[in-house]
């Protein structure tokens, strides 16, 4: 059967090697890798009324940049980040993660790089990788192409969930810096740089010093678990928005009651060079940028005005870049208004 499968384009031996390499990286004591299902022992005694919070996501067409650059070591971090930032924004403590990777041809070295990134992401999020799936699918994907998705599960006390329900006019909005574009908007990014301007991943732009364009674009998505967990334990976060696809305009309203709006103060945080380059090379309007990209802020928190100074001090004491970027007001028109500093 192995020979027949091999002739059909599926390399079973390479698949076995991948499992062996992953087991070695994860650790011999983790018996979930290679088993039929992942297991996680939950200590229920420490919870009164626990709620499980889950999320699934992928990395989108950022993968196309990784293919072009043949750099895959940070894609796994992106995959974990996209899932875990969503659940921590709801007040959950991450528990465990599973990954799914489909490829046209099994390349053990490449898959090892990807899974190493997943493990690094799980380490940053303080969660366990308890299993996953690698599927070789010739004819579905090109030989050197793959797709990756992740599944994260976390837990929170029911009365500690961050729902946004207690947000009110006058509350302060705090922005946590992003590491770059993160993992959204790459279809437009690739069109601007690679199609409209005929650049490559090896290009070096004066607006983006020190690294190639590919390196700038493959900067891994920031994981906010370590920053937010102490604040969640203190229960000072009223609402949180993970700034992903749709930028501020789509994501900030997701945490707000319908009668409230976010007033974001332009100039209250630094815009990263990659966004300035995108706007310049793509000739995009400013509002369009805020409607697509995170613009240097990957997570927005809503806190009471009296709590804001301590929250900012606590974040910045950890060498985190956090900024007071606006306030919550009664909604008059749009759910997000960009205002100029007075």
From Swiss-Prot:
PANTHER family noted in UniProt: TRIFUNCTIONAL PURINE BIOSYNTHETIC PROTEIN ADENOSINE-3, TRIFUNCTIONAL PURINE BIOSYNTHETIC PROTEIN ADENOSINE-3-RELATED
Reactions the enzyme catalyzes: 2-formamido-N(1)-(5-O-phospho-beta-D-ribosyl)acetamidine + ATP = 5-amino-1-(5-phospho-beta-D-ribosyl)imidazole + ADP + phosphate + H(+)
Residues making up the signal peptide according to the UniProt record: none
CDD domains in the record: PurM
Superkingdom classification of source: Bacteria
Keywords noted in UniProt: ATP-binding, Cytoplasm, Ligase, Nucleotide-binding, Purine biosynthesis
The encoding gene: purM
Classification of source organism: Bacteria, Bacillati, Bacillota, Bacilli, Lactobacillales
Native organism: Latilactobacillus sakei subsp. sakei (strain 23K)
Protein name per its UniProtKB record: Phosphoribosylformylglycinamidine cyclo-ligase
């Amino acid at each position: 059967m192995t020979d027949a499968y091999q002739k059909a384009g599926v390399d079973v031996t390479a698949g076995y090697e991948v499992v062996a390499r992953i087991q070695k990286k994860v650790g011999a004591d983790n018996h979930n890798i290679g088993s039929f299902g992942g297991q996680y022992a939950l200590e229920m005694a420490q919870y009164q009324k626990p709620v499980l919070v889950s999320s699934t996501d992928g990395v989108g067409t950022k993968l196309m940049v990784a293919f072009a650059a043949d750099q895959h070591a940070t894609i796994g971090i992106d995959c974990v980040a996209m899932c875990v930032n969503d659940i921590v924004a709801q007040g959950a403590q991450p528990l465990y993660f599973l990954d799914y990777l489909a490829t046209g041809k099994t390349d053990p070295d490449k898959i090892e790089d990807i899974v190493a990134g997943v493990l690094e992401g799980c380490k940053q999020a303080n969660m366990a990788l308890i299993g996953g799936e690698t599927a070789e699918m010739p004819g579905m994907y090109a030989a050197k192409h793959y797709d990756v998705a992740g599944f994260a599960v976390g837990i929170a006390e029911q009365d500690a969930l961050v729902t946004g329900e207690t947000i009110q006019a006058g509350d302060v909005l705090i922005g946590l810096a992003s590491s770059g574009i993160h993992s959204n908007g790459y279809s437009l990014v690739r069109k601007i740089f690679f199609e409209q301007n005929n650049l490559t991943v090896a290009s070096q732009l004066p607006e983006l010093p020190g690294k190639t364009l590919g390196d700038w674009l493959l900067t891994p998505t920031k994981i906010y678990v370590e920053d937010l967990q102490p604040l969640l334990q203190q229960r000072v976060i009223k609402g949180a928005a993970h700034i992903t696809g749709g930028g501020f305009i789509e994501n900030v309203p997701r945490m707000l009651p319908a009668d409230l709006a976010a007033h974001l103060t332009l100039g209250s945080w630094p815009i990263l060079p990659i966004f300035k380059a995108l706007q310049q090379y793509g000739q995009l309007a400013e509002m369009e940028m805020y409607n697509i990209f995170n613009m240097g802020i990957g997570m927005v928190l809503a806190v009471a005005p009296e709590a804001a100074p301590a929250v900012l001090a606590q974040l910045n004491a950890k060498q985190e870049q956090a900024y007071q970027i606006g306030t919550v007001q009664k909604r008059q028109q749009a759910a997000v208004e960009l205002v100029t500093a007075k």
